[in-house]
Amino acid sequence: MANLLPIDFSQISTYITLAVILILSVVLCMLAYRLMNVVPAKWLCDYDEEPDESLFGTRYIFKQSGIYTSALFAIFNLGIFAFFGYSYYTIFFLLISITMLLIAMSDFKYTIIPDQFTIALAVLCVALAITDLFTQQIFIKEWWSIPLGAVCGGGSLVLINLFSIVILKKSGMGFGDVKLMLALGACLGFPMVFSGLLIAVFIA
């Protein structure tokens, strides 16, 4: 991977690098908790609902779960750095990971994925996909892989939801999950989106 900045990072101590990533992960996690407490309550409601009292005031307390969340977030970011090193991929995935953390926190507590978070994720994913297409081509080899990956990602969840409704007689995932996979599918492209789906199913 080419360095993002014209600086010889090869001489930087590995321990210093790891410390920076760990500290940055904790800071970003604290920022995510802060953002979840200040975003408008309306963001955490369905379109036809009004915020109730539970959405006002403090929604997340860092001391209660922030340490565990920070640890998992740091491990993920260390993995990203180990794979991509000092490159724009690391920066993109760091921004994507913090957005995904906000989505996970919202979905976990309020079972809703705000459109604002999804739009931010989509912008980052498409930007990464286009950048990848014109540079390293790790995920995206052809331009049509971006829209096809998005369609396959979102479409797969639509089919799973239809199967759940018709066969199991109960609703599966919400449309927020479909929009989420549309964004991630654009980032991964076709056919890597299916690998992403398998990983998502395994984690879930």
Where are the language model's segments positioned?
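A membrane-topology feature that recognizes alpha-helical transmembrane segments
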Residues: M1-A204
